[in-house]
Amino acid sequence: MTTTPTAMPVSPSHDVIIAAAQRAARAIPPLWPLASSVAVNPFLGQGSEPLEMAGARLRRASGIAITMPRSWYAERLQSGQIAEQDLQAALQNAPAALRPPNLPALKQAVQAARPAPQALPTVAELARDADAVDWPGIVNERIGHWAAGYFDQGQALWAVGQSGGAYSTWRIIATHDLTPEIAGLAGFARYVAEAPANAEDAIVDCVARLGLSQDALDGYFHRLLTTLGGWGQLARYRLWQAELSGATDACVTDLLAVRLLWEAALLGNGGCTLVPGWQRAVAAYAEPVAATSDDVIDSILQEAAERAAQRKLSAVLAAPSPAQVASGRVKLQMAFCIDVRSEVFRRALESLDSGIQTLGFAGFFGLGIGHRRFASDVVEARLPVLLTPGVTTCAGDATSSAAASDLSARIAARAKRAWGRFKLAAISSFAFVEATGPIYVAKLLRDGLALARPHAPDEPAPRPADGLDLETRLTMATRILKAMSFTGGFARLVVLAGHGAKVVNNPHASALHCGACGGYSGEVNARLLASLLNDSQVRAGLAARGIVIPADTLFLAALHDTTTDAVTLYTADHPSPGHAEDLAQARQWLGAAGALARGERAVRLPRAHRSQDIAHRARDWAEIRPEWALAGCQAFIAAPRSRTAGRDLAGRAFLHDYDWRYDDGFGVLELILTAPVVVASWISLQYYGSTVAPESLGAGNKLLHNVTGGIGVVEGNGGILRTGLPWQSVHDGQRLTHEPLRLSVLIEAPPEAIATILERHPQVRALFDNRWLHLFALDDEGRMAHRYAGDLRWEQNASGARSCDHSVPMLA
């Protein structure tokens, strides 16, 4: 094979090239494996720039638009969902240089189709056009074939070794793979064998062969990493995890080297035919990214849609609250995750009795734990992915009987794994079906007819693995209760409800669990906190610190199944005969609230004509939409529950209890802005990205998914790893069920206090300054009084004035 480097005046230095490679690695988001998948902001690398600039950058890098088609906005204008005042306000807020001169010009632009987004070409794409061979497809297929084995987490019986790193492992495979040469890339195996043994040296060598200028590096490297889809993002996940522990990981750089070797080989194979087109492409990569007038128009229309939704939300919050305030002691208090799915259940539960109070807090309940399940050595990080575990916990007591049960469970698990490998092994799999098929008839019927009833996790109660001294336990309890704004007025029964989802035949099941628990269900954290707050020594210490929990108050953990709205109480953790009547009443209320919530959800779910259909759907192998998860999420509200109680927020708002009057120094407010708000933004923007650009930022069609390596899904039998949400998670087959809107964050706190915190956290501030999130300060009556205008400035919110229209029933 010969290589034909393009003309280049000055070759960038090694350090300059590697620095550009590292920047490109941070321009793509990480992808968590299926076992603990969490929502990730697909625009994580573009948070420092506004929507129009990110749109211009991703158009070049991925060939996608990151707003809806103009027709989507035109329909909303015509129907009145977007009012002229929304359009005018968004226009005035846009960059003056490129925005339409006036409202009529903007309305005219809405009717015109925007130019189709076009990515800058790679060498593989130029070679495809020249040779009529699908080189991009071949590159993706061969890299995907290797990567599925390299990143495998136990699915493959014969795993690819990982010694030496991704680049070295790929070279071993590629030097024996004749597929590229059969397709027409002569001498590719020899070319790879002769390439530098070190990934960084290979990158530098390829840059020289490709004739890349320094200015072209960032854009071109970013472009190549986007062509890798989820494989590049999985490598970015490894870097993310390494950096959390103060280390680093070269996997992204290794994959970039692999992709560059393909590019250099294809350019050399194409000879002079590809050089003119490639030189034009290099020049285009070297041009600075600049937003066009179309990018600005699209960003204006997107903001207008968001202002329309904010106007309706403002009317809901300004209307008189229908909630009744009970006199005397509260009968039941129940703390839920802030997840939007909890809003429906909380509203249903509170409607049953004025003596019921619910609270909202991040579902990990302030306990950053690494947890080992019963009979397992795998440590599960049950906390937001932005954090690292501070405490290790395990299931079961440290007793001889527990140890015997642990050993028995481990032996059974190993036998099950051995049987599973026997079923799939190269030789035994052929005889397996004929020999043992009849044994599985009953199971096939039970599963195929959705007769099996899944149960909530019921492991032994969790405990700290190494024990915690009293001062540590007391500090944790104090911090958590203050963060929950829950320091008084305790009921006799306080339920701490984590949440999870019981579904079948769903590779993305963990994405339905609690994002604040790292993609796991939340019962472990809830059970740990209940034990902590029932500790008599902790209660005595809390009383000395001014938090008095009555002696008759019992804390219990629960698990809210968001698919069926069933609630499991972990009463065995803390038996209390004196609370038998309280528990009986609570069970009755929870059953009734579940029925109300299922009835509300059934209206939105396809083929769920009755609330009774919900449970059957959760057990149905063929059900591709067991629940809508967080589709429709629109707002994050941190305020006292009295501001939202009784108001129909339609399961579209994250609800976090917060009272700034009891937050000395605004430490709790700082925690909310830097943790739950950021996690909610990741969720919101993943839904946004999977809706506006499903072909690139979404996971594709569930019906075509195949799990690969136990880490992710591909469509069909190979290729790139898909990321984001499946199309069925945002679309019901006829229309979108998720309205792509950037999250509106509403906080009841003094605007100057919020601004002070933003000033201390530049990365969080950038999300608001560049309007990836909208920010409002609520006044003392819960109205959206102040809008954040960027650069630590606030303005009066026109729609936050006292509303005269009290007829708005819900967010729509």
UniProtKB/Swiss-Prot annotation:
Annotated S-S bridges: none
Main location group: membrane
A GO-annotated cellular component: plasma membrane
Record has Zinc as a keyword: yes
Gene Ontology molecular-function annotations: zinc ion binding
Residues annotated for Zn(2+) binding in this entry: C337, D339, H499, C514
Key words, A-Z: Cell inner membrane, Cell membrane, Membrane, Metal-binding, Transport, Zinc
Cofactor(s) listed in the protein's UniProt record: Zn(2+)
Known role: Part of an energy-coupled inorganic carbon pump.
Subunit structure: Forms a complex with DabB.
Family as reported in the entry's similarity comment: Belongs to the inorganic carbon transporter (TC 9.A.2) DabA family.
Protein name: Probable inorganic carbon transporter subunit DabA
Lineage, uppermost ranks: Bacteria, Pseudomonadati, Pseudomonadota, Gammaproteobacteria, Lysobacterales
Gene name in the database record: dabA
